[in-house]
Structures are given as C-alpha cells and as structure tokens.
C-alpha cells in the first residue's frame, strides 16, 4: 500500500515536469511559454530603453570639458613627491637600497619635465622665467582642439632636478621632495597679501606667486631641521600664476603642474623629525579634517648607519 502511494507521488511530479497528454512543460504549453517569454523580453526591453534614454538626457546636460557644479569643490590639496606610505621617508645614508625607491619615484615623476618632452611648440609655450599673471586661454568648453600649456624647466629645480645628482641628495643625507598643487579645472589661486606671510617669506613676496614654506611640525623639532633650500621658477619658492587656470585633460592633456623643490640640507640623524609644508594664498584654505588641504606634513627618519 505504501509502495503504491510512493509510486503515485513519483508519477505526479514527473507528470508536472512533462505532461505528455497535454504536451505541457512545468504546467505550460509551448504557446504559453512563448507568450510569457515574449512578455518579459518586451517588458525588460522597455525598462532598458527608459534607463538608457534617461542617461542620454542627463549626459546632454553634462559638459565633457568641465564639471557642472563647482561651487562646493574645496581648494586643491597640497601633496609631495615621492609619494610614500604613512607620509614617512626613512632611509640609511650609506645604504643605496634603502633610498632607491624614493629616487625612482622622483625620477619617474620628473621624466615628463625633461626638455626633450617639451619640444612640441604647438602644445608647449615658453611663459617666461619669472612669475606673471594668469594665462587665460578661452572658454572651458572649447571644442576647437587642445590649448597650449606653459613649459616648466626641470633645471629650475637645481639640486633637486636629478640632473647633477641622480640621487636627489639622498646619498648625502640631504633629501629632496617636490611639492605640487593638485589640479582643479578653472581654479585660480590668489596670491597672499604680504602682511599675511610668515616673517621668513615676507621679504620674498611676489604678487604673482603662491609661496610654499616648510617648518617644524612640533616645537621640539625646530632645532633638528636645519637649513631648508627652495627651488622653483626663477628661484622663487612657489607656484607662478601663469600656470593657471587648468583647462582639464581634454583640452590640456600635457599640462605640467608648477613645482617647488624643497631640500633639507641638515636634518638631524637617528631621530624622527616631523615637517609641515604650507602654501599661502587668499583663497587657500586649511582643514583639520583634511591634512592635505593647503598643507601636508611628512616625517623624516634618516639613519647614519
């Protein structure tokens, strides 16, 4: 009796999967399956069409050349090269392997600043050797083609150019870092007022320059930094205004950010030294929540052996 019930159960589910009498698969005939599949193809096709149409309409309102809304964009951050984890540079003076990653990072970044990479006069423009005013190059949504960019001579970085010393001072315990301002389309940094500058910078004021200055992050490190040398355009320790505004990757794909090289020539060995570098300008802001907004700090740990 039990075996008969089991056989009936087996027959029921087999019949549900394929009913040979009614020619039904899973309770539906071939015509029914065709109709329901056709319905879902049309249904999801319409959904996809609505989605694609919405995206296309949205893209019509978005410029490919510049962001539509920039009123909430924070001023660009200040960063350094070499790019290091935990913003720490640690090496041993007489061990080339310990500072080789920093040297390679610097050399790789500076390759595009070499004279041989800036020979195309259709793209690159000589904007002078001293800071001057902004270089306006027309509208930001210009579809006429690429806009020119200012050349930046690697030689301006002097001891930190890697041309005379291919270790950028690291083999002598005098490390160099490169300071740069991140790119934001249309941003025009405004030079600071002279009276707002630290005393070390007041005598080097230039109305067309965003100066950069590095000091001890902690009071106890003030006597461990030693002399700091700055190298930039025309010997000025800052970013010249003629490199701004930036027009974006489509219009200025070979844009070169102005650089300031900072060399620490007499850091104390075998102790950790924290340094803070800041840029100064009327529209430069600082934030405790973002340690790279207008400034950054970096730790040096140079071992004598």
From Swiss-Prot:
Q: What does the UniProt entry say about where the protein is found? A: Cell membrane
Lineage, top-rank taxon, reads Eukaryota
Keyword Phosphoprotein in annotation: no
Q: Which residues lie on this side of the membrane: Cytoplasmic?
A: 1-35
Q: Where are the transmembrane segments?
A: 36-63
Return one Gene Ontology term, BP aspect.
Answer: sodium ion export across plasma membrane
Q: Which Gene3D superfamilies match?
A: Na, k-atpase alpha subunit
Any Pfam family: Na_K-ATPase
Could you tell me which cysteines form disulfide bridges? 127-150, 160-176, 214-277
Query: A single GO molecular function, which one?
Result: ATPase activator activity
Bilayer topology: Single-pass type II membrane protein
Task: Give the UniProt keywords, A-Z.
Answer: Cell membrane, Disulfide bond, Glycoprotein, Ion transport, Membrane, Potassium, Potassium transport, Signal-anchor, Sodium, Sodium transport, Sodium/potassium transport, Transmembrane, Transmembrane helix, Transport
Asked whether the keyword Ion transport is assigned, the reply is yes
Broad class of where this protein is predominantly found:
membrane
Q: Which NCBIfam families match?
A: Na_K_ATPase_bet
Q: How does it assemble?
A: The sodium/potassium-transporting ATPase is composed of a catalytic alpha subunit, an auxiliary non-catalytic beta subunit and an additional regulatory subunit.
The task this protein performs is described as: This is the non-catalytic component of the active enzyme, which catalyzes the hydrolysis of ATP coupled with the exchange of Na(+) and K(+) ions across the plasma membrane. The beta subunit regulates, through assembly of alpha/beta heterodimers, the number of sodium pumps transported to the plasma membrane.
- Which protein are we looking at? Sodium/potassium-transporting ATPase subunit beta-1
Q: Which organism is it from?
A: Gallus gallus
Taxonomic lineage of this organism?
Eukaryota, Metazoa, Chordata, Craniata, Vertebrata
